[in-house]
Structure formats: structure tokens, C-alpha cells
């Protein structure tokens, strides 16, 4: 495809337009008085959101070069979301200000590379100061952080605080939709471990990049699976039952993984696979724990068990399994509660007779996973749109609270960034020329989150920042008063602020040092066979159904795998998918 090229100031100005386009839509979502953004969806009702990452992902700009700028700032939001779970709007606001100030200075003759060095020096200084101001999160502060992160929603803050108190910070907390109007907290059996899906093709929710299986059957084995020959009988039983299916194995690779993906995509099986957690003997022990939790039989080589002998009775079950790219969460049924309790007691006895402190720690980790259970936050709402909105708010608040437990908290409302901005003066004075300018770009950007929080609450941002500096107090946008924000419980997770700063400086510096921008030139839409305005589907043949191969391996008669369906010309039956069923 032909490329459109843009050079030097022209390219940077076009990129800036894209950055501003996204940032101006995103920054209304920051603070306790934030505004909502309504997003049209191709199917279903529109979404109403107050989440920077969600807004940024939906934006496309007609100008291809400006759209590159939009995608760069969307990357800031998504990266911060992925790493910290919150802080996307803060990161976006910081990036926009750095880009704007940087481009002004470049237009005046500043060297982009020196600006970049200055910005990076400023970032290092800011992160050091941020760490020194961070304090550990006490138990009573958990609800405060959760409430602030939920935009001041005390109900959400209370529910998350209760969930954290019951399952502890290491426990599993999941958010799901409820059939009622009320948002409730439910504690059930379950656990999570650090392994994700074997292939992204198993994802069931493309927007969240998550695979969710409701009431699945579960095969657990310590064997490596590279071919599905031995699993054909059990797969046929699963297909007949219509149940979702999870394979948890030492590894699943090659032909076996390819075949599962093909059958998943063709709708033959609702299946996913996950590699077993840990390594060596600890892996086997972890699989035994999961087998107890789900009521499965561990198919182990040590017991001379083979996959071809697996029956439906050997499989485990769960209420729900949620799999991300790096984590699996199992919500179990209550009927395994006694088995889990017995397993925990057995592990406690092992701790008492184990002399190695390292082994004791590892066994205690297993006990915590098994005994902790899963806290289910069931989100209730009157409409589908409200449900999505509340669910996003709870997920953001939960992520921010976990981040606060990890690295502590600082005064919220942007107050900490303003204090550090003043400290940057000392570093700026010891630097020269464009290096100093780069530091000052970061210094000015640190004021922007507070200005936008104030603006969203109906106040003048510049006046608010000046008053914060004069009074040496923070600004409570809820009450419109200046006060000690730590005493008021307005706290920001240090991790969220740190990652927002790192991601914003990274993208802003890259954009400022860009000299050439290249984008595809959009091709004009081709006219249909009948000319402009004609039915675009005209002239197409009928669409045939995919042909279905049999189940099994080549050479097994009518159960060949992967079998090709009939391949015909358009309108003659269509092209079959390779599959095994």
C-alpha cells in the first residue's frame, strides 16, 4: 500500500493534533467530579464510561498522520492500565502537556535529543522524590484508597475493603455481573495461579483479552501433550455434553495446540488450555491441590495413568474459570469444601515436620492459596449500560487498591506532584540550555493533573495550583476546600503515579524526537458491480457451510484429523475449516 510521508515540524504538528484529540476526550474523566463519555457500539446499547484507556481505544482520526499520534497516546493509556490497572487518565494528561511544551521549544530551535535527556533526568529525580514521600498502606486506609479510585463512590470502596479483609491482599477477588439490582459480595472456594492461556485464540472476550469458561469440565495431568490421539475419546464425550473444557497440563504444544485452536475457532469445542504452574515436584504438588479443589483425578505418569484411559468421571469441574494472558482464576463449587479443608490440614502437618525454612514458606503459600478462597463482587444494575459502567469502576478501584498495597500511597489530588515540581527547580538550576528546558517540561507537566481535576469540578486550575503552593495543603475537589489530604483519606497509589510518569515521559520523548511520520494512504472504496450505490453483495454466490473432518488422527478411518471440508468456488458450498470433528 502507498505511504503518506510527513517531515520534521509538519509531522510533529500532525502527531500533536492526534495527541490533543485523544487527550481532550480522556481528561474529562479524572477526579471525583469527572464527567462521563458515551461511546457508540456497532452492536447493542452504547457504553457510558469514565475510564481513560477505554475512551482512548475507541478513537480513530481521519488524517492518517494525526491518527498515529492518537495511537501513540492510546499506547500510554493501555500500557499504564496493563501495568498498574489504573492511572490511565493521569498518564494521558502528563503526556499531552509534555508534547505541547516540547514542540513549542523545538519550534523555537531547541534540540529534541537534548530535551529528551533533560526529560529523562527530570523523571529520575521525580521518581526518587516520589519514593521518599510514599507511606505504607494501613488497614484502615484500604477503604479510603478504594473509594477515591472509584471516583468517590463509598459503596464500592466499602465492598472492596471487605473483600480484601476476608481474603487478604494475596487472595483472589473477581468481578462479575449479577442478576439483581444490588451489588453484593460473596465468598466461595477457589484459587488462582500465575499461568495464562496457551494461545490468545482461546480468548472469549476480545475487548478485555480474557477467556471465560462457565461450568467447565477440567482435565488435569502432569504429562506433556503434543498430539491429541489419546484424547479423542474424551473429546468426543465433551463435544456431546456441550460443556466448556479446560486442559491443564505440563505443556500442550504442536499439533495438539493447533487442533484445539482450530476446533475452538470453528465452534466445534469451547476449549482452552493452560500450562501447569511452578516446576518439578512443586508443579506436581500444585496440580494435586488444583485437583482437590475441582474434584478431578490427577492423570499422572507416576501412577501409570495414560490419557487414552481418561473418562468423564476423571474430570474436575468449576463454577467459572477466568484466564488472562498470565493468570488463571478458578471459582470452585462448595461440594469440594471438605476435601479442601482436609488438604489444608495435611499441608499444615507437613509444615510442622519440615525443617527447611524455604520448604515451609512454599507449603504456606499453597495453604494460603487453598484456604483463602475467592471473593466474588457481583455487580448489580438496572440496565446493561449501567452494569458495564459500574463494573469498570469497580475493576479500576480494585486494581488501584492492590497497587497501593504493593508500593504504598502518597497524598492524592495531584498534591504530591506539585510538591515534587517545586523540588525540580533545584535540579533545573544546575543544568544548562536544552537539558534544563527538558527538565522544565516535566516540571510544568506535573501541575496538569491537579489543574484538570479542579477544572472538572468547576474551579480555575491555575488558581487552585497557586493556592496549594501558598497554603501548603491539598485541594479536595469534592468539597472545594484546601486541607491535609492524607488526613482526609484522599490518597493515590504510589505505583500508579510512578507508572503513569514513566509511560508518559517514554512516549512524549519518542514523539518529540520523531523526524518522519509514515502512514498508509487510504484507498478509495471500490464501487460495486452495479456502480456506486449498488448492492455491495450483488454477484456473490451462496455461502456454504464449512466441511467437518472427523475426530482422530490420519489413518483412523472416518475419524481423520485434521480433515478438510469440501472446497468449492464461491456459491458452491464454501471452504471448510480444517478440524478434527
UniProtKB/Swiss-Prot annotation:
EC number(s) reported in the record: 5.6.1.7
InterPro entries per the UniProt record, alphabetical: Chaperonin_Cpn60_CS, Cpn60/GroEL, Cpn60/GroEL/TCP-1, GroEL-like_apical_dom_sf, GROEL-like_equatorial_sf, TCP-1-like_intermed_sf
Any one cellular-component term (Gene Ontology): cytoplasm
Subcellular location: Cytoplasm
UniProt KW keywords: ATP-binding, Chaperone, Cytoplasm, Isomerase, Nucleotide-binding
Reaction(s) catalysed by this chain's protein: ATP + H2O + a folded polypeptide = ADP + phosphate + an unfolded polypeptide
Biased composition (Gly residues): 528-541
This protein's record includes keyword Ribosomal protein: no
GO-annotated molecular function: ATP binding; ATP-dependent protein folding chaperone; isomerase activity; unfolded protein binding
Broadest EC class assigned to this enzyme: isomerase
Domain of life: Bacteria
Any matching Pfam family: Cpn60_TCP1
Chain residue ranges for the region called Disordered: 522-541
Binding-site positions, ATP: 29-32, 86-90, 413, 492
One of the protein's GO biological processes: protein refolding
Quaternary structure and partners: Forms a cylinder of 14 subunits composed of two heptameric rings stacked back-to-back. Interacts with the co-chaperonin GroES.
Function (record text): Together with its co-chaperonin GroES, plays an essential role in assisting protein folding. The GroEL-GroES system forms a nano-cage that allows encapsulation of the non-native substrate proteins and provides a physical environment optimized to promote and accelerate protein folding.
Family: Belongs to the chaperonin (HSP60) family.
Entry protein name: Chaperonin GroEL 1
Species in which this protein is naturally found: Prochlorococcus marinus (strain MIT 9301)
Classification of source organism: Bacteria, Bacillati, Cyanobacteriota, Cyanophyceae, Synechococcales
Amino acid at each position: 500500500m502507498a505511504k503518506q510521508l510527513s517531515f520534521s515540524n509538519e509531522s510533529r504538528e500532525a502527531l500533536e493534533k492526534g495527541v490533543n484529540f485523544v487527550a481532550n476526550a480522556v481528561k474529562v474523566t479524572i477526579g471525583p467530579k469527572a464527567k462521563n463519555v458515551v461511546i457508540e457500539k456497532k452492536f447493542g446499547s452504547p457504553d457510558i464510561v469514565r475510564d481513560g484507556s477505554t475512551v482512548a481505544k475507541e478513537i480513530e482520526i481521519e488524517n492518517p498522520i494525526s491518527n498515529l499520534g492518537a495511537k501513540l497516546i492510546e499506547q500510554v493509556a493501555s500500557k499504564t492500565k496493563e501495568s498498574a490497572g489504573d492511572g490511565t487518565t493521569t498518564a494521558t494528561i502528563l503526556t499531552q502537556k509534555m508534547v505541547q511544551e516540547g514542540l513549542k521549544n523545538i519550534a523555537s530551535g531547541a534540540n529534541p535529543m537534548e530535551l529528551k535527556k533533560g526529560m529523562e533526568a527530570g523523571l529520575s529525580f521525580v521518581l526518587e522524590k516520589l519514593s521518599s514521600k510514599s507511606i505504607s498502606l494501613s488497614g484502615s486506609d484500604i477503604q479510603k484508597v478504594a473509594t477515591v479510585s472509584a471516583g468517590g463512590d463509598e459503596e464500592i470502596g466499602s465492598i472492596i475493603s471487605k473483600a480484601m479483609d476476608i481474603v487478604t491482599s494475596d487472595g483472589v477477588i473477581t468481578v462479575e455481573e449479577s442478576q439483581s439490582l444490588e451489588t453484593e459480595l460473596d465468598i466461595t472456594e477457589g484459587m488462582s495461579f500465575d499461568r495464562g492461556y496457551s494461545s490468545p485464540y482461546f480468548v472469549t472476550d476480545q475487548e478485555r483479552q480474557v477467556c471465560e469458561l462457565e461450568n467447565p469440565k477440567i482435565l488435569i495431568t502432569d504429562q506433556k501433550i503434543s498430539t491429541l490421539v489419546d484424547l479423542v475419546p474424551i473429546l468426543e464425550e465433551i463435544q456431546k455434553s456441550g460443556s466448556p473444557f479446560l486442559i491443564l497440563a505440563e505443556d500442550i504444544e504442536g499439533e495438539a495446540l493447533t487442533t484445539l485452536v482450530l476446533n475452538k475457532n470453528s465452534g466445534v469445542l469451547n476449549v482452552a488450555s493452560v500450562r501447569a504452574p511452578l516446576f518439578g515436584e512443586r508443579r506436581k504438588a500444585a496440580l494435586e491441590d488444583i485437583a482437590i479443589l475441582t474434584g478431578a483425578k490427577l492423570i499422572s505418569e507416576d501412577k501409570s495413568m495414560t490419557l487414552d484411559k481418561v473418562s468423564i468421571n476423571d474430570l474436575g469441574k468449576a463454577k467459572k474459570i477466568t484466564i488472562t494472558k498470565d493468570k488463571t482464576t478458578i471459582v470452585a463449587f462448595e461440594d469440594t469444601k471438605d476435601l479442601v479443608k482436609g488438604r489444608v490440614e495435611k499441608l499444615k502437618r507437613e509444615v510442622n515436620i519440615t525443617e527447611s525454612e524455604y520448604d515451609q514458606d512454599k507449603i504456606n503459600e499453597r495453604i494460603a492459596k487453598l484456604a483463602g478462597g475467592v471473593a466474588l463482587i457481583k455487580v448489580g444494575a438496572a440496565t446493561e449500560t449501567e452494569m458495564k459502567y459500574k463494573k469498570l469502576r469497580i475493576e479500576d478501584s480494585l486494581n488501584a487498591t492492590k497497587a497501593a498495597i504493593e508500593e504504598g500511597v502518597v497524598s492524592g489530588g495531584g498534591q504530591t506532584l506539585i510538591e515534587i515540581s517545586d523540588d525540580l527547580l533545584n535540579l533545573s538550576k544546575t543544568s544548562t540550555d536544552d537539558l534544563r528546558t527538558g527538565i522544565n517540561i516535566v516540571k510544568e507537566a506535573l501541575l496538569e493533573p491537579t489543574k484538570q481535576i479542579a477544572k472538572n469540578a468547576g474551579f480555575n486550575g491555575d488558581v487552585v495550583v497557586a493556592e496549594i503552593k501558598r497554603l501548603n495543603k491539598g485541594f479536595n475537589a469534592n468539597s472545594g476546600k484546601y486541607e491535609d489530604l492524607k488526613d482526609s483519606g484522599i490518597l493515590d497509589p504510589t505505583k500508579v503515579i510512578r507508572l503513569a510518569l514513566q509511560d508518559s515521559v517514554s512516549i512524549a520523548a519518542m514523539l518529540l524526537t520523531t523526524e518522519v511520520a509514515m502512514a498508509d494512504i487510504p484507498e478509495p472504496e471500490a464501487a460495486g458491480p452495479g456502480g456506486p450505490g449498488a448492492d455491495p453483495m450483488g454477484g456473490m454466490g451462496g455461502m456454504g457451510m464449512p466441511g467437518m473432518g472427523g475426530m482422530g488422527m490420519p489413518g483412523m478411518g472416518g475419524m481423520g484429523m485434521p480433515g478438510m471440508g469440501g472446497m468449492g468456488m464461491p456459491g458452491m458450498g464454501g471452504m471448510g475449516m480444517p478440524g478434527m470433528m
